[in-house]
Amino acid sequence: MSFPRGSYDPAASNSSPWWPLSAEDANSSWEAAGHQKGSDPSGDVRNEELAKLEIAVLAVIFVVAVLGNSSVLLALHRTPRKTSRMHLFIRHLSLADLAVAFFQVLPQLCWDITYRFRGPDWLCRVVKHLQVFAMFASAYMLVVMTADRYIAVCHPLKTLQQPTRRSRLMIAASWVLSFLLSTPQYFIFSMIEIEVNNGTKTQDCWATFIQPWGTRAYVTWMTSGVFVVPVVILGTCYGFICYHIWRNVRGKTASRQSKGSGEDVAPFHKGLLVTPCVSSVKTISRAKIRTVKMTFVIVTAYILCWAPFFIVQMWSVWDDNFIWTDSENPSITITALLASLNSCCNPWIYMFFSGHLLQDCVQSFPCCQRMVQKFTKDDSDNMSRRHTSYSNNRSPTNSTGTWKDSPKSSRSIRFIPVST
């Protein structure tokens, strides 16, 4: 995954097109790094050690994302349980994360390996469009799933009005909106001829911006559309969910206390009668805990994965003192690459909170199933042996001595005649 470079590539750059710099910015960064003004900043070289690190990180992310999301899809396909609306959203979220793996991470991995983009102009435009499309799809699928949970908890009566149809419309809207918002990539990126190695010409897939505000406008728009807006919506929806459940629990608790004191008075809140939406306090408590935990994990994972990338992007275009060689810092490069790690986390988060999905996923693989059966059998045998040993060492009086050592064993029993 990457944001565009500008119309000129400094010598210090790696193969990943991370920071969109103009020719003037690149030259000033080269001079600020301590090079002479007359030296050539256009050598077609890169930091090979850092490039190898980028390739390794992207390869691991790609493998983990594909395996994790494919396992979720396989578990959903083979589960014997009835498919719910949440399963529908999880399925499409996994598809969106697979799009991130194949349309975003994999092209960037190939690009890092070849250093320069190898392909015609139309392929350059398509690749850049699909990369951003995957970013939008993964973020917006999470948003519509959160919106569905908000409707289910805060407006339960609306779930009776064709809930499956509404869910499918929300999912379709997120896919279409993601495609439309990423369409400008076709007009921003193209194969551009650049000058390297003292006048040698080559081509690469770059973006062309109106200077000096074009780059800032693009990065700010992407940061707002992919990160800021989804985080605000996620936080707002889950905030209402937690508040609604907390108010429901408080109303139910007050009702129980009034019944215990013999007062037949319903709890009031701001002059309105508070009626619990769920019939069981225990059920509400579990739902509250599960919602709070899932909220914390989802929002935290999303922010931790995406925040470093967008912080670096915004810093690079809004800080006039930003030096190009700062992008060669391995820590900055790796934190930017880890944005795609969110697609690796999502399947395991939902399998953990869904419970049975993890079991269905394990049962989908024969090797894992045999391993689980072996461990279960070993545990059963160990329990059986412990139970047998415990039973043999207990006396008829449940003392710790053995049967033959018991004072009430068979040899001390006296047969007393019974009168008839």
UniProtKB/Swiss-Prot annotation:
It is found in: Cell membrane. Keywords: Cell membrane, Disulfide bond, G-protein coupled receptor, Glycoprotein, Lipoprotein, Membrane, Palmitate, Phosphoprotein, Receptor, Transducer, Transmembrane, Transmembrane helix. Glycans are attached at N27, N198. A lipid is attached at C367, C368 (S-palmitoyl cysteine). InterPro entries: GPCR_Rhodpsn, GPCR_Rhodpsn_7TM, V1R_C, Vasoprsn_rcpt, Vprs_V1A_rcpt. CDD domains: 7tmA_V1aR (cd15385). GO terms for cellular component: plasma membrane. The modification Phosphoserine is found at S406. Pfam families: 7tm_1, V1R_C. It is a multi-pass membrane protein. GO terms for biological process: cellular response to hormone stimulus; positive regulation of vasoconstriction; regulation of systemic arterial blood pressure by vasopressin. Residues 1-54, 114-125, 190-225, 316-331 are extracellular. Residues 1-20, 379-411 are annotated as: Disordered. Disulfide bonds join C124-C205. The chain crosses the membrane at residues 55-75, 93-113, 126-146, 169-189, 226-246, 295-315, 332-352. Residues 389-403 have a biased composition (Polar residues). One of its GO terms (molecular function) is peptide binding. Residues 76-92, 147-168, 247-294, 353-420 are cytoplasmic. PANTHER family: NEUROPEPTIDE RECEPTOR-RELATED G-PROTEIN COUPLED RECEPTOR, VASOPRESSIN V1A RECEPTOR. Belongs to the G-protein coupled receptor 1 family. Vasopressin/oxytocin receptor subfamily. In prairie and pine voles, the 5' regulatory region of AVPR1A contains a microsatellite region that is virtually absent from montane and meadow voles. This species-specific microsatellite polymorphism modulates gene expression in a cell-type-dependent manner and generates a great individual variability in the brain expression pattern. This polymorphism is correlated with monogamous social organization. Prairie voles exhibit a monogamous social structure in nature, whereas closely related meadow voles are solitary and polygamous. AVPR1A is expressed at higher levels in the ventral forebrain of monogamous than in promiscuous vole species, whereas dopamine receptor distribution is relatively conserved between species. The partner preference formation in the socially promiscuous meadow vole is increased by AVPR1A gene transfer into the ventral forebrain. Receptor for arginine vasopressin. The activity of this receptor is mediated by G proteins which activate a phosphatidyl-inositol-calcium second messenger system. Involved in social memory formation. This is Vasopressin V1a receptor. It comes from Microtus ochrogaster. The lineage of its organism: Eukaryota, Metazoa, Chordata, Craniata, Vertebrata. The gene is Avpr1a.
